[in-house]
């Protein structure tokens, strides 16, 4: 569960990015933040993984205040998919998906099995896509790789910041529907 208890963010110049927020997102629940550009959606999500620290209040993941969790531990337990996808252009699809597994020091066999499983899960057969590079993929395929990477280490929390905003409207609808189907299977 993710809990915001009076969590707010005010920048040093006095700009209020997030007014005090009380919100609970239960395990396995999909929560979508909707609002105008600049209203604090991204800042709210960034407070969960401490890319932004709350000015007041607390943000908790599974009952632990994120400010008390060692940063590396916190971030390794959260999958994160962003609008710009954030794939490493010099790494193959396979190596992009394996990034977090490597940070967790998984052995090669476990990592390879997990990468294959995740690529299959997002509809990118490993034999066909594993050795490709991001520039060889469509926008929707790159987004799927980003989702596979975010899920590879089986994090208890998955944050997605406008994950389908960079693709065309038809692909976006298809990816959103696929994500909801995927979420039902993995319960993230």
Where are these regions (language model features)?
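Conserved ABC ATPase "signature" region
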Residues: 102, 109-128, 181
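Helix-to-loop junction immediately C-terminal to a conserved catalytic motif
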Residues: 49
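Conserved ABC ATPase signature
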Residues: 132-137, 141
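A short, proline-enriched helix->beta-strand linker immediately N-terminal to the Walker B motif
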Residues: 152-156
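Catalytic Walker B motif of ABC-type/P-loop ATPase nucleotide-binding domains
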Residues: 158-161
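The feature captures the beta-strand-to-loop junction immediately N-terminal to the Walker
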Residues: 34-36
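Conserved ABC transporter NBD signature motif
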Residues: 57-65, 74
């Amino acid at each position: 569960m993710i809990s915001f208890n009076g969590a707010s963010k005010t920048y040093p110049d006095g700009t209020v990015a997030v007014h005090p927020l009380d919100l609970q997102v239960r395990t396995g629940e999909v929560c979508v933040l909707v609002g105008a550009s600049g209203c604090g959606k991204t800042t709210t999500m960034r407070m969960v993984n401490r890319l932004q620290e709350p000015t007041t209040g607390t943000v908790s993941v599974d009952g632990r205040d994120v400010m008390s969790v060692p940063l590396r531990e916190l971030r390794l337990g959260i999958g994160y998919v962003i609008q710009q996808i954030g794939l490493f252009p010099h790494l193959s699809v396979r190596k992009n998906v394996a990034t977090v597994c490597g940070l967790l020091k998984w052995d090669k066999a476990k990592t390879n099995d997990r990468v294959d499983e995740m690529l299959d899960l997002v509809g990118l057969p490993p034999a066909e896509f594993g050795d490709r590079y991001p520039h060889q993929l469509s926008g929707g395929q790159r987004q799927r790789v980003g989702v596979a990477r975010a899920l590879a280490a089986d994090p208890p929390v998955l944050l997605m910041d406008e994950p389908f905003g960079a693709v065309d409207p038809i692909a976006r609808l298809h990816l959103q529907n696929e994500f909801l189907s995927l979420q039902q299977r993995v319960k993230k």
